Curated annotation (Swiss-Prot):
It is a multi-pass membrane protein. The chain crosses the membrane at residues 5-25, 53-73, 81-101, 133-153. Residues 26-52, 102-132 are extracellular. Keywords: Cell membrane, Membrane, Transmembrane, Transmembrane helix. It comes from the Eukaryota. The keyword Nucleotide-binding does not apply. The keyword Transmembrane helix applies. It holds the Pfam family CASP_dom. Homodimer and heterodimers. InterPro entries: CASP/CASPL (IPR006459), CASP_dom (IPR006702), CASPL (IPR044173). This is CASP-like protein 2U3.
Length: 178
């Protein structure tokens, strides 16, 4: 019972982290002006301008929906087939979210530092608020990845462990006096 509660709490935590990561990124935008001589030129930053950030929003949304469904399934059914499915899906979605977070981290790094070999300048000096919120979204997403990895480990131990994780404790036989 305690393991089931822990699993549900971890899945709820993954839901909350993924929703927060998606919302922070999806709402992230900033408008600014730079001066070219005496002419102010407007600049705009939106998450939708960068494919990796769009991927991050969708991946977080998919993980949140999956974890919600997994909570319902784990509360309603107990079977080895379901345990195997959750084990597989926990890993698959951890990899999906890790890929989205890694791609977005690379874009954020280039935005912060630039890429000298390609003569790309950094942009975060003009969009500090935008870049800070990208960082917040990435932290939330990587935390969600860690929760999913933990769930995959727990699912694997439950499925393949000897003795199985969360198995009911065996009670020693009661000896009756002769």
């Amino acid at each position: 019972m305690a393991c089931r509660v822990m699993e549900v709490l971890l899945r709820v935590l993954a839901i909350l982290l993924s929703i927060a990561g998606a919302l922070v990124m999806a709402k992230d935008k900033q408008d600014t002006f730079v001066m070219l001589g005496t002419v102010p030129v407007p600049l705009y930053a939106r998450h939708s301008y960068v494919e990796a950030f769009v991927f991050l929003v969708y991946a977080n949304g998919i993980v949140a929906i999956y974890c919600f469904i997994a909570v319902l399934l784990s509360l309603l059914a107990k079977s080895r087939v379901l345990a195997g499915l959750l084990f597989f899906m926990d890993q698959a979605l951890a990899y999906l979210l890790l890929a989205a977070a890694a791609a977005s981290t690379e874009v954020a790094y280039i935005a912060k530092r630039g890429e000298k070999k390609l003569v790309w300048g950094e942009v975060c000096s003009n969009f500090e608020h935008f870049c800070n919120l990208v960082g917040v979204s990435l932290v939330l997403t990587f935390l969600s990845v860690l929760v999913l990895v933990t769930l995959a480990i727990l699912s694997g131990k439950r499925l393949f462990g000897h003795p199985p994780l969360c198995a009911p404790p065996s009670t020693p036989p009661v000896h009756q006096g002769v």
